Structure formats: C-alpha cells, structure tokens
C-alpha cells in the first residue's frame, strides 16, 4: 500500500513539528520523517526550554517575538481546551549582562527596537535592586576554578544589563 502526502517534512523536532502542524492546519497531508525514534529526541529534547525574544539577527528576533505571542495562549493555538494538561509558558523575563564580549548587546537592542520588542536597560544599581541574588561586579579575565584569583572582581568596574520581560521558559506538563 502506498501513501501519498502533499508535503514530507524532514525532522520532527520543534521546527519540523511546527512546520508539519502549520501545513496540516492548512489542509495539507503531511509526514514528518526523523532519524531518531520519536519526535523531539534530537537537539529539541536536549534544550533547556527557554523562550527568548532577543537575537542578533532581524529574522531570528522577528520569528522569536512572533512565537512568543503563540506561547501566551498555547492551548488556543493548538485548538485544545484550557483544561488539557499542556506544557505551560512561564513568563518570568530574562536578564542579560552587557559586556565587551557581547558588544554591550548593541546589535540585539537594535533588532529589538526595530521590532518593538519590549526591553529595559538596567544600570548596575538597578540590576542589584531588581535581582538581589545577582551582582553587577565584573569578573575577568577568564580563569580556571582552581586559580586562587578565580572569584576576584575587576575593581571599579560594574556591569549593566538588559531585561526582556517577554522571555521565560516552558515547564514540563
């Protein structure tokens, strides 16, 4: 017996599954093919389930911010009742330090600004006020943990950060 499909999607991780799902919602008969034994067993299964909206590319940032809006009402997006046990988006936000190594997030902030992705720039005092378990102290250069100077800070230098309120993580249903 031979099956016919309108689209064969290579991969059954988060991207492949999403492509197959969207095509099927439009009436296409789809088949997802993956080299692993089950959906989501590749890099998707190894992810830490972070939902973030900050990327250095415009396309990456746009795709992530659009996806954020689907996560906000995941059950409706999937066409399910609210009482069905599902993975849930926990919108707790994300703070990223501004460092020389990440060019103080200049490119990321430019992309976020172009797309009206909400963010707040925090000075070092605001970092410690908003997130008391964090420090704005700067550490460096990189040292091995067994180095006696491993935990020494760079005197007189403190880090600001950027907070993205629309970030979070997906729990495990």
Each model region followed by its residue ranges:
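C-terminal lid/capping helical subdomain adjacent to the catalytic/cofactor pocket in oxidative enzymes
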Residues: 2-3, 26, 121-124
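Helical element adjacent to the flavin cofactor pocket in flavoenzyme catalytic cores
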Residues: 153-173
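Glycine-rich FAD pyrophosphate-binding loop
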Residues: 24-44
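Short, flexible turn/loop "capping" segments at secondary-structure junctions
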Residues: 43-45, 87-89, 154-157
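Short beta-strand/turn micro-motifs composed of small residues
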Residues: 11, 34, 98
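Dinucleotide-binding Rossmann-like beta1-alpha1 core, especially the glycine-rich loop
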Residues: 48-149
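Beta1/beta-strand and adjacent pyrophosphate-binding region of the FAD-binding site
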Residues: 2-15, 31
């Amino acid at each position: 017996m031979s099956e016919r499909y309108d689209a064969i999607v290579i991969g059954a991780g988060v991207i492949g599954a999403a492509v197959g799902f969207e095509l099927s919602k439009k009436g296409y008969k789809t088949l997802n093919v993956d080299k692993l034994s089950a959906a989501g067993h590749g890099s998707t299964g190894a992810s830490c389930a972070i939902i973030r909206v900050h990327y250095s590319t415009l396309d990456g940032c746009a795709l992530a911010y659009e996806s954020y809006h689907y996560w906000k009402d995941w059950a409706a997006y999937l066409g399910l009742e609210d009482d069905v046990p599902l993975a849930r988006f926990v919108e707790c936000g994300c703070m990223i330090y501004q460092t020389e190594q990440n060019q103080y997030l200049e490119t990321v902030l430019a992309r976020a600004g172009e797309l009206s992705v909400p963010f707040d720039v925090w000075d070092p005092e605001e970092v410690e006020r908003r997130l008391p378990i964090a420090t704005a102290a700067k550490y460096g250069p990189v040292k091995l943990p067994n180095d006696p100077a491993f935990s020494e800070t760079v005197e007189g230098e403190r880090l600001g950060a950027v907070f993205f309120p629309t970030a979070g993580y997906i729990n495990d249903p």
